[in-house]
């Protein structure tokens, strides 16, 4: 049952004096990658691969088992997106503090915004190279979870924490490019790449996390999990 930890990245911990956060890979006792170690599966990593992750999440109140600020009068979602004001934005202090912590830790956090549902927020991470991108999103999540403890809150990443209701779920949109995509300026090339996903889309969905069938319904700015599409500025497409 013993496992080994292999340090792979280190970040200063802005919250603790002279502290550091060390990202590790988990190895079996014989040195082989543990089954949970997805990082070890990355091969041919290259700084030419650019990733932009948009991580959505809910600030979750354990006492009510609902999002922070969830309306008691069942006010429908809509007014909370990119909102301001005490009737609309709940938990901005946490979001702002998380932004500062990530910046001070050297994580390339690109932005934040209030999301569609009450108590729902998003932060964005950019990195060059798959391993670095994964390291930064995981460490940013860790900082967020630890920060929420100070407020007696949890961070909820479930794709559809409010179930089959008229409230958005959470995902993590992944923006990707390489030199070809950034420089070709060819609609035909973009469409050919998107089409290459069509026969293997189920293989991708299988490793994108649990419960995505609850979120990918075709509603709330999603494509159905059983369909595949792409389009320019199409928020209901599989690939936008």
Predicted regions, residues:
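Glycine-rich, acidic/polar active-site loops that bind/position phosphate-bearing ligands
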Residues: 1-240
């Amino acid at each position: 049952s013993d496992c080994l930890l292999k340090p792979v990245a280190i970040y200063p911990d802005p919250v603790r004096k002279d502290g550091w956060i060390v990202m590790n890979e988990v190895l079996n006792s014989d040195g082989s990658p543990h089954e949970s170690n997805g990082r070890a599966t990355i091969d041919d990593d290259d700084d030419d691969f650019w990733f932009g992750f948009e991580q959505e999440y809910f600030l979750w109140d354990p006492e009510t088992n609902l999002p922070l600020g969830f309306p008691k009068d069942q006010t429908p979602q809509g007014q909370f997106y990119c909102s301001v004001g005490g009737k609309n934005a709940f938990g901005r202090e946490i979001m702002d503090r998380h932004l500062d912590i990530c910046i001070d830790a050297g994580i390339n956090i690109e932005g934040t915004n209030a999301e569609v549902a009450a108590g729902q927020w998003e932060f964005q991470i950019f990195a060059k190279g798959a391993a670095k991108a994964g390291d930064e999103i995981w460490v940013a999540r860790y900082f967020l979870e630890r920060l929420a403890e100070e407020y007696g809150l949890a961070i909820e990443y479930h794709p559809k924490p409010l179930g089959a209701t008229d409230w958005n779920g959470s995902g993590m949109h992944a923006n990707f490019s390489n030199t070809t995509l950034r420089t070709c300026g060819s609609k035909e090339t973009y469409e050919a790449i998107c089409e290459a996903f069509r026969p293997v889309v189920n293989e991708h969905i299988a490793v994108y996390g649990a419960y995505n069938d609850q979120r990918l319904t075709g509603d709330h700015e999603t494509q159905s999990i059983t369909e595949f599409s792409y389009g320019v500025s199409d928020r209901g497409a599989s690939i936008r």
